Amino acid sequence: MSAPMTLFADVNWQPVIDAVRQARSIVLITHCNPDGDGIGSQMALYDALIVAGDGRISMHNRDGVPRIYSFLEHSEQVQMGDWPSDAAKPDVIIALDCGARGRLGMPDEWFDGPTLINIDHHASNRLFGDINIVDARYCATGAMIFDLLIAMNMPLNKARASGIYVATLTDTASFRLASTTPAVYRMAADLVEAGAEPWPISVQVYESRSLSGLHIMTACLDTLEMRDDGRSAWVYVTDDIYRKTGADVEDTEGLIDYARSIDGVEVAVFIRSDEVVAERWKVSFRGKTCVNVGALAGELGGGGHVHAAGCQLTGTLDEVRARVQVAVSRSLSSF
């Protein structure tokens, strides 16, 4: 196997490497309701750091690890929930794939003292770290970890390759988005050579839906609304749908893609109720060709990428839908 080549050689990883080498304790964390990129990046970096450093390495996610990613090595090491108030603070916190500190779901005082390293590929990232490595050229944060490992002279193994492969697979919509450049395919080849197994990973990620997941899928699709002369498609999951189907937020993964797949649709909108806070809604956007949904989400206080983005809004469903409709129609009006 030839030595892997970095995707972007001009990124300066030295501040991260220096902070990691000097730290006695490090916590890796990703955003609330984590996705494949956050979890895959976390697992790959954890596997490297437990070998590279003498310090204590741990992982903590407010919402743990989604079931479909629990096959990744080290996933059982993730601590879940609020950070214990009596626990010692680490020297370094590494936030992965998170555009804003608030999305980590931890209290502000948790970040007082430790060096906070922010590694992310969202253009809307708020640069909340003491050290910020934020680069929207990358297709996934996992691809950034690939380059970081090369900078650390850490070889790929099956655990690292599998984590990065999951991160890249899920954040490129199975290598379909425009961010999937020739360099990304070359990276994928390096990952497979190092032990990542595309078909078993695909089965775990895409072919392991629970029965309740099927129920919520049919209930969600029953809510489909076509708007903007057929150029936007809207689907919903309410508290009532959660109760009737017995599903949870993990089971809603990918539902918005059915709306985007409709011929003629340029923007898909998925509005789901927050499982914890009443009248708080998570709004997801998916774009097809002409609309930058990252900019659309930014109008509503959120962010993301050109083809995938989101925000969080409060109010009744009708109020939220009305606000989103104005922004969607405005985005479509130029095309």
Feature roles, as predicted:
Residues 29, 33, 95, 118-119, ...:
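Generic enzyme active-site microenvironment
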Residues 36-42, 101-104:
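Short glycine/serine/threonine-rich phosphate/pyrophosphate-binding segments
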Residues 73-131:
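Active-site cofactor/cluster-binding pocket
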Residues 116-118, 132-133, 232-234, 270:
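Conserved beta-strand scaffold positions in the cores of enzyme catalytic domains, especially
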Residues 119-188:
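Short alpha-helices
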Residues 46, 74-78, 134-137, 286-287:
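Short, hinge-like loop/turn segments at secondary-structure boundaries
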Residues 33-34, 98-101, 122-124, 239-240, ...:
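Short glycine-rich anion-binding loops that position phosphate/pyrophosphate groups of nucleotides
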Residues 2-32, 40-70, 84-90, 170-299, ...:
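Hydrophobic helix-and-loop "lid/oligomerization" segment in the mid-to-C-terminal part
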